[in-house]
């Protein structure tokens, strides 16, 4: 896989800052051009630190009332649970930005997973005005973390959800705790205007190498399936995560 951009920072702190800078830049660009920025958030420690920076150091860099927040996946837990991706984003960023409720489009992790996935699909179809079964939303920016096993969102190796071609969101059950989750599907991710991976730590080095330079095996390395049809991929990582690249 050849990324549109591969950016390697010296350390994690530099990565957090650069990620916040990139998100703020993309947001301002989209708002200037389209009057709105649709941002699909991810969970994890690296995004959390960047979210905190967006709500503090970069608070004045973005017209936040024009940003619509979505999620790439969610653990099936209440929003106040420490494992909740919405809860993390709310604590680190959203609660500090004086947003209107209608700007926040969260997956309802507290509901029954299949029902929550169907409801999220309905919300996406309504917001993006998708009328046909084969239509997919076009987010301005989708943020993705990367699991040690090369999973993205909650699309794990060898999971049937990797092959979903029509639905926008699915309920998945995986071995990693919390085992029940909701995830956007790969066609949604690949319909984005821009996808940005945020990856840090030596534990992710093998996954990064296998996705970017390894043999084609998307069943084993789901990150290889991330190929925006009309958009670009930005890989933003620290030196430790990039240490396996040649």
Q: Where in this protein do the model-derived segments appear?
A:
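N-terminal glycine-/serine-/threonine-rich phosphate-binding loop
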Residues: 1-39
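A short secondary-structure junction signal
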Residues: 117-118, 152-158, 207-211
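Glycine-rich beta-strand-to-loop/alpha-helix junction loops that act as flexible
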Residues: 41-46, 144-148, 200
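Class I SAM-dependent methyltransferase SAM-binding "motif I" and its flanking Rossmann-like core
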Residues: 141-187
């Amino acid at each position: 896989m050849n990324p549109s951009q591969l950016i390697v920072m010296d350390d994690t702190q530099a990565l957090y800052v650069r990620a916040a800078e990139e998100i703020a830049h993309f947001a301002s660009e989209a708002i200037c051009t389209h009057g709105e920025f649709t941002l699909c958030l991810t969970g994890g420690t690296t995004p959390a630190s960047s979210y905190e920076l967006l709500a503090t150091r970069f608070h004045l860099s973005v017209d936040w009332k024009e940003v619509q927040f979505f999620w790439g996946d969610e653990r099936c837990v209440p929003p106040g649970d420490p494992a909740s991706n919405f809860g993390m984003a709310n604590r680190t960023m959203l609660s500090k930005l004086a947003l209107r409720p209608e700007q926040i489009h969260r997956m309802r992790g507290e509901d029954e997973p299949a029902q929550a996935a169907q409801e999220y699909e309905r919300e996406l179809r309504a917001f993006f005005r998708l009328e046909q079964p084969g239509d997919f939303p076009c987010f301005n920016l989708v943020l993705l973390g990367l699991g040690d096993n090369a999973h993205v969102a909650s699309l794990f190796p060898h999971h049937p959800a990797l092959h979903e071609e029509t639905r926008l969101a699915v309920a998945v059950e995986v071995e990693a705790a919390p085992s029940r989750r909701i995830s956007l599907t790969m066609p949604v991710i690949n319909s984005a205007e821009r996808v940005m991976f945020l990856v840090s730590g030596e534990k992710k080095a093998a996954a990064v190498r296998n996705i970017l330079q390894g043999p084609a095996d998307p069943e084993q390395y789901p990150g290889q399936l991330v190929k925006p049809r009309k958009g670009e991929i930005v890989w933003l990582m620290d030196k430790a995560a990039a240490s396996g690249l040649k």
